């Protein structure tokens, strides 16, 4: 049963706060102190029954007993609730249900300091020692409390069992005051008002005061006020007597704070007004942001010494710290103004960069540009550039403490905005007023820092744009230079000729041109002694190039200059006037073979020797082919230099000669006579046989077949003579 109807906090909310305060994300067994204090206020305000609060903490111990870090943080939360939860919660916590579970199950089973496994595990041993230290501290705190004596009984049992309790750091300072936390009192039931003593009826209803627990009528319990000392942060119903006590206590506290803040000034109601304080803060901010033009900045005035109060009240520690901080800040400001140069005290003019002014005449109407001689233009050195930017004052950023103050003020204002009950008591919150004054003083500094950051961003953005433009121009200039360099690139001839420039990529090969392989000049042959004409543009029409086993090289005209190449019509005329011979068969085994008639006719018309000539051997009339006497060396001029129009090819070794193929025998008009002379007819053989046997007299005798020649015997056709073809002379 909850004490206050309409403001009951569910148990799920309490359990979620407990889980959040002892979260796994918090390392080293620590807890979130802010949420833990909210839990203690929730327990102390009696919004949730104390037994249910104890069972929620016990449930968290059950779920985290296997993790030493989470168990340590949960035990720290339980200890904080013991010191701030109120006496009604201590009664439930020191009951047999919670203490036996903590000692008999968690400590003796999982974290027993006598167990060897726990002793070897350092983390578990620390948790066991921490449980023993908590039981010892609670025993000292609950001393002479009859309702809390079960903790002391468990402590003596553990001592009798031989457990050693660690020495507590604050054991000698612990007393009953550690658990003296105010809690809402129990309600008193009565049939009449405790102030006017009017009996309660249907029209005069009964109300309880949350501060004292008494029963009052509507007339004497119409005030609402937060009870911070009892852990109640929202305004609740109080009686007239309790309201006057709370009001007098708050007024004394406010007057004490005002006397400490302004002890030399007389207390006046106008000075306490919030509007007056806001006006002073605005004037102070305007005075700080104002920049003098020609006047010297006056040094800050030293703060007047604090006059001791005649009442003899001791100064608060926070006020002493504030006075020390103000004195330290005054000394720093005075030291800064002494070190500030006189030139910087005059009107500050924003420096203008001269780095990009004289690159291009952007503004020729500028008088500084017209009056200045280009030869006398000052050069922008890095030192001068650094000196100009060194004169610019540096804006101080917000410190970490100032940022925390701003964030705290924002958080408090958001809480007040969401809670309408706190808005009525905002005038009585002295801490919030003091924090508001500090935030107002930080506003000019924050504006300066923001303006400096924006200017720095714009400057960096402008420099980035300039760098991008310059990089693009440089890339375009470099690309143009590279294209020009590649266009003028030349390749020298391997035979000492003039350089040949490449204009564009290699043209595609549209014809299959046979180019003889160059032969090293060191290789010589006795049978190649004549210098034949130069081979140029020999191609086989209608025949694809056959693989020869060697690398294919480009044609002659592919790597030559355009000025050295004759037109296509001139090339055809030169070919018809000066026909050239194909390459030797030793270089190209597979070549196009012309018919005998075409070869003979071409040789007779041009007066050139045939491709092959036959010579008579000593063994008989057998004709064997004879290779043409042509050199495979590049053609040379009269002065011994190589021809420039010769193909530019690397100097490879000559390939090995292949098996020559015999050309077809020449056929003339007397071929039938030759065949008849060499191979006589059957009639001639019969007549010759008859003449041989009968001497030409016996014609009726049957002729016999000629005898076949035996293997190894010399041929009997030596008398037969073949008609030799006369070899024409070679034109040199």
Curated annotation (Swiss-Prot):
Subcellular location: Endosome membrane
Limits of the VHS domain: 23-166
Renumbered zinc finger spans (FYVE-type): 187-247
Domain of life: Eukaryota
SMART domains per record: FYVE, UIM, VHS
Low complexity: bias regions: 364-379, 524-541
GO CC terms, sorted: endosome membrane; ESCRT-0 complex
GO-annotated molecular function: phosphatidylinositol-3-phosphate binding; ubiquitin binding; zinc ion binding
Record field: compositional bias (Polar residues): 491-513, 542-579, 592-607, 629-651, 683-695
InterPro entries given in the database record: ENTH_VHS (IPR008942), HGS/VPS27 (IPR017073), UIM_dom (IPR003903), VHS_dom (IPR002014), Vps27_GAT-like (IPR049425), Znf_FYVE (IPR000306), Znf_FYVE-rel (IPR017455), Znf_FYVE_PHD (IPR011011)
Its job: Component of the ESCRT-0 complex which is the sorting receptor for ubiquitinated cargo proteins at the multivesicular body (MVB) and recruits ESCRT-I to the MVB outer membrane.
Quaternary assembly: Component of the ESCRT-0 complex composed of HSE1 and VPS27.
Stated family: Belongs to the VPS27 family.
Protein's UniProt name: Vacuolar protein sorting-associated protein 27
Species: Debaryomyces hansenii (strain ATCC 36239 / CBS 767 / BCRC 21394 / JCM 1990 / NBRC 0083 / IGC 2968) (Yeast)
High-level lineage: Eukaryota, Fungi, Dikarya, Ascomycota, Saccharomycotina
């Amino acid at each position: 049963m909850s004490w206050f109807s309409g403001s009951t906090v569910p148990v799920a909310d309490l359990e979620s706060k407990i889980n959040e305060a002892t979260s796994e994300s918090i390392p080293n067994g620590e807890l979130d102190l802010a949420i833990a204090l909210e839990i203690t206020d929730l327990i102390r305000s009696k919004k949730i029954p104390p037994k249910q609060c104890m069972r929620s903490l016990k449930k968290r111990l059950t779920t985290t007993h296997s993790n030493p870090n989470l168990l340590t943080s949960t035990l720290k939360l339980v200890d904080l609730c013991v010191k701030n939860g109120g006496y009604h919660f201590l009664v439930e916590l020191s009951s047999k249900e919670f203490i036996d579970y903590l000692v008999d199950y968690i400590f003796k089973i999982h974290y027993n300091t006598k167990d060897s496994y726990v002793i070897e595990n350092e983390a578990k041993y620390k948790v066991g020692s921490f449980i023993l230290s908590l039981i010892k501290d609670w025993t000292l705190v609950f001393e002479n409390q009859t309702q809390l004596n079960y903790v002391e009984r468990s402590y003596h049992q553990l001592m009798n069992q031989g457990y050693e309790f660690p020495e507590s750091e604050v054991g000698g300072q612990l007393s009953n005051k550690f658990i003296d936390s105010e809690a809402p009192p129990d309600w008193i039931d009565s049939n009449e008002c405790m102030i006017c003593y009017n009996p309660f009826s249907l029209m005069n209803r009964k109300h309880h005061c949350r501060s004292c627990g008494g029963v009052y009528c509507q007339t004497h319990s119409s005030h609402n006020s937060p009870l911070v000392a009892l852990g109640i942060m929202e305004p609740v119903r109080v009686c007239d007597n309790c309201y006057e006590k709370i009001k007098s206590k708050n007024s004394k506290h406010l007057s004490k704070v005002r006397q400490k803040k302004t002890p030399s000034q007389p207390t006046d109601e106008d000075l306490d007004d919030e509007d007056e304080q806001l006006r002073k803060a605005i004037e102070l901010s305007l005075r700080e942001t104002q920049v003098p033009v020609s006047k010297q900045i006056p040094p800050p005035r030293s703060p007047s010494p604090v006059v001791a109060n005649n009442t003899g009240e001791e100064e608060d520690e926070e006020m002493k710290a504030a006075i020390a901080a103000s004195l330290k800040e005054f000394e720093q400001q005075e030291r800064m103004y002494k070190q500030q140069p006189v030139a910087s005290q005059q009107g500050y003019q924003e420096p203008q960069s001269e780095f990009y002014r004289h690159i291009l005449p952007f503004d020729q109407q500028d008088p500084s540009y017209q009056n200045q001689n280009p030869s006398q233009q000052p050069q922008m050195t890095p030192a001068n550039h650094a000196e100009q930017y060194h004169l610019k004052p540096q804006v101080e950023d917000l410190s970490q403490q100032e940022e925390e103050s701003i964030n705290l003020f924002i958080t408090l204002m958001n809480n007040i905005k969401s809670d309408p009950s706190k808005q009525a008591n905002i005038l009585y919150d002295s801490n919030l007023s003091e924090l508001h004054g500090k935030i107002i003083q930080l506003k000019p500094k924050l504006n300066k820092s923001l303006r400096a950051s924006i200017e720095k961003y714009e400057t960096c953005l402008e420099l980035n744009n300039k760098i991008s433009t310059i990089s693009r121009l440089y890339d375009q200039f470099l690309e143009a230079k590279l294209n020009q360099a590649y266009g003028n690139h030349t390749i020298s001839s391997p035979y000492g000729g003039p350089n040949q420039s490449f204009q564009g990529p290699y043209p595609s090969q549209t014809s299959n041109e046979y180019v003889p392989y160059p032969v090293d000049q060191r290789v010589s042959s006795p049978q190649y002694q004549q210098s034949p004409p130069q081979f140029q543009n020999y191609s086989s029409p209608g025949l694809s190039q056959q693989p020869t086993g060697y690398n294919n090289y480009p044609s002659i005209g592919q790597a030559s200059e355009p000025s050295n190449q004759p037109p296509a019509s001139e090339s055809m005329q030169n070919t018809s006037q000066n026909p050239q011979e194909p390459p030797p068969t030793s270089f190209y085994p597979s070549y196009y073979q012309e018919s005998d008639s075409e070869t003979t006719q071409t040789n007779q018309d041009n007066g050139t020797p045939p491709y092959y000539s036959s010579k008579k051997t000593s063994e008989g009339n057998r004709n064997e082919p004879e290779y043409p006497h042509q050199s495979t060396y590049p053609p040379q001029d009269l002065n011994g230099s190589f021809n420039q129009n010769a193909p530019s090819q690397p100097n490879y070794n000559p390939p090995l000669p292949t098996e020559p193929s015999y050309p077809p025998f020449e056929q003339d008009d007397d071929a039938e006579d030759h065949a008849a002379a060499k191979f006589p007819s059957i009639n001639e053989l019969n007549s010759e046989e008859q003449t041989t046997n009968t001497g030409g007299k016996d014609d009726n005798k049957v002729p016999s077949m000629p005898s076949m020649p035996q293997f190894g015997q010399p041929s009997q056709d030596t008398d037969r003579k073949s008609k030799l073809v006369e070899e024409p002379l070679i034109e040199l």
